[in-house]
C-alpha cells in the first residue's frame, strides 16, 4: 500500500514522501496515528494544499521538543527497586516506570517515546534514549538501586553488587584437611 507521510518517520522517510508499506503497518500505525494518508489523487492534492500548514506545525513541534531536550539531555533519574544479592531485579523497569519518573520530575514524556529494546532487569546505571520528536533524540541516565544511599554510591562509580569473595588459599587448606581426614575411600577415620 502506498501512503504519503505527514511527518518524518524513522527508517521510512521524510514528510511529503510517497512510500510503499505493508497494509497492516499502514492501517494499524501510520493511518491510525495520523502520520500518513493513503496515496490517492485526492489525498495528494489535499496534501499539497496543506503542505505549508503541516510544515509549520512540524516546525513548532520540533522547537517545543528541542526546548524540552535542552533541559532533559544528560539528566539522571533514580529508581528504587528490590533485587537479589547478585543485582538482578525481582521485577523490571519498563517504559511505563520511566515515563512516571520523568513526569514526577516535571517532564511530559510518554512511554512510547523511550527506545528500550527490553526492560531493565539489573541494578546500575543505564542510558536510555528518548525520542521527543522524529528529529530530536536525547539520552537520560537511569540509576536503578535498592536504596537512595546505594544510588549515590553507584553515581560515584562504586560497585554495589555483593560478590562471594573467597580466599582461595584458605579454601585449599580446608579441602586438603578434609581429604586427609577422610582417608583413601572417602570414609571418616
Curated annotation (Swiss-Prot):
HAMAP family, A to Z? Ribosomal_bL9 (MF_00503)
* The family this protein is said to belong to: Belongs to the bacterial ribosomal protein bL9 family.
On whether Transit peptide is a keyword of this UniProt record, the answer is no
Q: Which UniProt keywords apply?
A: Ribonucleoprotein, Ribosomal protein, RNA-binding, rRNA-binding
Which organism is the protein's source?
Methylobacterium nodulans (strain LMG 21967 / CNCM I-2342 / ORS 2060)
Q: Which Pfam families match?
A: Ribosomal_L9_C (PF03948), Ribosomal_L9_N (PF01281)
GO biological process, alphabetically ordered? translation
Indicate yes or no for the key word Ribonucleoprotein.
yes
Could you name the Gene Ontology cellular component terms for this entry?
A: ribonucleoprotein complex; ribosome
Residue spans making up a coiled coil are none
Gene that specifies this protein = rplI
Q: Extract the InterPro entries matched here.
A: Ribosomal_bL9, Ribosomal_bL9/RNase_H1_N, Ribosomal_bL9_bac/chp, Ribosomal_bL9_C, Ribosomal_bL9_C_sf, Ribosomal_bL9_N, Ribosomal_bL9_N_sf
The molecule here is called: Large ribosomal subunit protein bL9
Q: Which GO terms describe its molecular function?
A: rRNA binding; structural constituent of ribosome
User: What is this protein's function?
Assistant: Binds to the 23S rRNA.
Amino acid at each position: 500500500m502506498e501512503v504519503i507521510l505527514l511527518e518524518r518517520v524513522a527508517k521510512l522517510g521524510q514528510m511529503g514522501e510517497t512510500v510503499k508499506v505493508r497494509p497492516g503497518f499502514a492501517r494499524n500505525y501510520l493511518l491510525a496515528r495520523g502520520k500518513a494518508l493513503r496515496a490517492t489523487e485526492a489525498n495528494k492534492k489535499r496534501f499539497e494544499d496543506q503542505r505549508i500548514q503541516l510544515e509549520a506545525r512540524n516546525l513548532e513541534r520540533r522547537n517545543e521538543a528541542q526546548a524540552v531536550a535542552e533541559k532533559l539531555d544528560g539528566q539522571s533519574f533514580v529508581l528504587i527497586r528490590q533485587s537479589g544479592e547478585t543485582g538482578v531485579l525481582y521485577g523490571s523497569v519498563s517504559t511505563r516506570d520511566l515515563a512516571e519518573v520523568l513526569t514526577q520530575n516535571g517532564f511530559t514524556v510518554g512511554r512510547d517515546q523511550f527506545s528500550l529494546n527490553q526492560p531493565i532487569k539489573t541494578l546500575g546505571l543505564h542510558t536510555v534514549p528518548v525520542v521527543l520528536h522524529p528529529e530530536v533524540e536525547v539520552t537520560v541516565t537511569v540509576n536503578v538501586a535498592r536504596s537512595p544511599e546505594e544510588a549515590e554510591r553507584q553515581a560515584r562509580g562504586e560497585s554495589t553488587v555483593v560478590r562471594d569473595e573467597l580466599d582461595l588459599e584458605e579454601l585449599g587448606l580446608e579441602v586438603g584437611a578434609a581429604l586427609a581426614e577422610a582417608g583413601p575411600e572417602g570414609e571418616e577415620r
